[in-house]
């Protein structure tokens, strides 16, 4: 018995981990190299040092967003969202924990305080996943780019939204439908030693800890920042591509273009912090720790497609970042995903060839946790198929089951979907208690699902 897993991201790692723990041999393919041999250079004008400002001592195969050869690399934010079960992301993570999720184990191992959010040290996080996969006796890792599948073997495709061009062409021929796509943007990271901490305060919204640094801005400072942000040069897209953004992760300049106050009612809102600040504070910019030690800080909600030069110019208008050194600048990349509602069963099997299962963000789920969770389900269903049993999905009353139902049955054009409570069937109780009772029901039903299918001995 053997299963091919294509891609060593969050979903692929979860699928391989589940199968290997069931005694099934896994061949895991990852095109990113064993070593990338980057020599960092610092840009004297911008203070930036990044792999995009680096020399290479050997050619590599990678993507436009990845920087390392590690498994489960987090290319955008370093947070997996809230861990409170009355949020969609928090409930999904609790369900994943019941399913023995490798990603949740890695997140707990590399946890960085961030209020009610599950933030991680991204290096420790991916190191944990990489070491777990490489040390498993039932997993063989093959470092090469896959260009096509043996369609008679059992395959789990977890190549993510940055699937390579060659494999994308193969998939397009296989499924006969075009991919959908959206543009995703990454937020900058600054060195903590370059931040002026006299221009703000530490604290989380609604007094949930002191894990964020809040850079304060007066209305005059905000006005200058806002106008320069609108004027700033952006990275151009290809002429033939229509720019489509995911509403849950809009570039900061796109939000600003919708009106003067959209930022102060969005990522720069002082909501939940007002009793800490004086009356002349009009907006705040939150910085979140990227590592346990806090030597690197990311700009929360500041994903951007501005050119590198303009990012440095505009973001240094934020008072606490006047002399900021950027260890990573923001960037934009094109994310592709399947029209899963036309192509996949809720079990994540390809309708035209059940030997091929898909998992991860390529299926149309959005967010780290949702991507990883689909990897667990793909692994479970590959195992059931090898056991001669029917593939299955968790009940629609669970967040994971509801997500799978949504992406495989939505009418019309599919757009990426986060785990949200609106996907769950209603429950007749007072609004005040509805989310909590939905969460309890979901966890109870997930436990029954696990027991019924004997997923864990």
Curated annotation (Swiss-Prot):
**Which cellular compartments is it found in?**
Cytoplasm
Q: What's any GO biological process attached to this entry? A: tRNA wobble uridine modification
List every stretch annotated Disordered.
Answer: 38-58
Superkingdom assignment: Bacteria
Q: Binding positions for FAD?
A: 7-12
Asked if the Swiss-Prot or TrEMBL record annotates the protein with the keyword Transmembrane helix, the reply is: no
> Which GO MF terms does the UniProt record name?
flavin adenine dinucleotide binding; tRNA (uracil(54)-C5)-methyltransferase activity, 5,10-methylenetetrahydrofolate-dependent
Q: Please give the family membership noted in the entry.
A: Belongs to the MnmG family. TrmFO subfamily.
Which reaction equations make up its catalytic activity? uridine(54) in tRNA + (6R)-5,10-methylene-5,6,7,8-tetrahydrofolate + NADH + H(+) = 5-methyluridine(54) in tRNA + (6S)-5,6,7,8-tetrahydrofolate + NAD(+); uridine(54) in tRNA + (6R)-5,10-methylene-5,6,7,8-tetrahydrofolate + NADPH + H(+) = 5-methyluridine(54) in tRNA + (6S)-5,6,7,8-tetrahydrofolate + NADP(+)
Identify the keywords attached in UniProt to this record, alphabetized: Cytoplasm, FAD, Flavoprotein, Methyltransferase, NAD, NADP, Transferase, tRNA processing
Explain the purpose of this protein. Answer: Catalyzes the folate-dependent formation of 5-methyl-uridine at position 54 (M-5-U54) in all tRNAs.
Q: What is this protein called?
A: Methylenetetrahydrofolate--tRNA-(uracil-5-)-methyltransferase TrmFO
Indicate the secretion signal residues: none
One Gene Ontology cellular component annotation held by this UniProt entry: cytosol
Q: What is its main location?
A: cytoplasm
Skewed-composition ranges (Basic and acidic residues): 40-52
Q: Which cofactor does it need?
A: FAD
- The gene behind this protein is trmFO
NCBIfam families according to UniProt: gid_trmFO, PRK05335.1
Q: What class of enzyme is it?
A: transferase
Entry's EC annotation: 2.1.1.74
